Structure formats: C-alpha cells, structure tokens
C-alpha cells in the first residue's frame, strides 16, 4: 500500500519486530491482543519463547511510521506447536499465538478484525502482510484462492514470502473481511507453490483460556511508552512439502 490513505480500514494489521532478529506480521483481534504465528514468538536456537517485551507491534506501519506501537506483555503459544520440530502438517495446524500488549490500541486508531467462525468461507480470499522487499509498507493481495481444507489445515495460492509469517488470510464476509487463517508456511501442492495455514476458532479459544489462567500484572500506564526498534532481517513463512517431517 503506497499511500497512507490506502491503509484506511487495515490499520489493525502491523509488523511485529523481533528485537532486531527479524519480523513477522500480526493482527489485532482485540484492542490489546495480537494474533500471529507461533513460530514467530519462539527463539529459533533456544526453542523457548521470546521475552514478550522484546516484541514490538507496529500497527499500520508505513515508511517507518506506525499508527500505534506497543510492546508485548504476555505471550500464549499453542501447546501443541513444537518449536523443536521441522515444519509439518501437525505443526501448521497449531502454529498460532496471541500476544497481549502492554496497553490497548484504541479502535479509533486501529479497529480489530473479527475471526471467521463458519465453514462457508467460499474460495476467494485475500492476504495482507509485510515481507522481504516490502518490509516498510503493508502489501495486500486482493484476490487469491482457497485450494483445499483438510483436518484443520488450509492450502491457498496467495503469494507468501519471508516476513509473511503470521499474516492474516481473509474470507470475504459482508462489508469487511474476517480472518480465516494465518500464513504458516509455504510449500508444494501438486507441483504448485502454495501457502499453508490453519483454521482458527478453536485454537484462539484455547489461547485466550491460557492467557486467563496465567495472568500478568499490567505495567503502570504513566510510564512513557517504549520507542520503536528496528528489524532488518526477516523471519518468515517456511517452505515445506505437505506432510514433511
């Protein structure tokens, strides 16, 4: 999106800067909750969760300027996602995480997206993401195709690249898209390059319950907000073959 006006209605999609170690895409689903891929919130080598306060959500980022910026306060990654294992259908199915922010972002700045909860999403979908070569501005593929859904894993022909991980895949429902899935990985299906994601309602419900079971103290909001960091490298969609271990 080359103009700030192009962002209208899409401000809730932002870049997740990972303490200078790359970035992913995240989306507000509540004023203080960002939805992204689980593999984005893990340290690659240590296979442990990144410190929440080292993750910076930059809503509606364009040319170095965000609509709003917040640090992470708490992370919930799906317990059935295994960061120690290579990409697989099992991991794609559970590659979901929520990040609670230190302070809500008001709806007048960025209106959170709803989750698609039905089965009849149709085959026409869209994706909005940051990625290699377009890290400073949100890029939106307005039309791509849902190819197949099986065992809570979705395949689509949307263009995914490094940095696209965690990007929302939208079903066209009513006047505003609803989040159908997240970009988890890229791979091959019938010799075609495709993206893979997962169904979301059950996973998100489980992650919200996890956050409620493990509450953390909200910092004093009188403290000055932390400033934006930089994320020069990219941490993005993995390229795998379906069923690969």
Please provide the spans of the model-predicted regions.
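Protease-domain processing segments flanking chymotrypsin-fold serine proteases, especially trypsin-like
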Residues: 1-28, 204-245
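Conserved catalytic-core segment of clan PA serine endopeptidases
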Residues: 1-8, 42, 47-105
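Extracellular/periplasmic catalytic domains that process cell-envelope and extracellular macromolecules
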Residues: 6-9, 28-29, 48-51, 89-93, ...
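Catalytic histidine site
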Residues: 9-56
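Short conserved beta-strand and strand-loop elements enriched in small hydrophobics
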Residues: 14-16, 53-63, 123-129
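Short beta->alpha transition motifs characteristic of CBS
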Residues: 37-40, 180-189
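Chymotrypsin/trypsin-fold serine protease catalytic domain
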Residues: 93-96, 101-160, 164, 201
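Catalytic nucleophile loop of clan PA
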Residues: 159-183
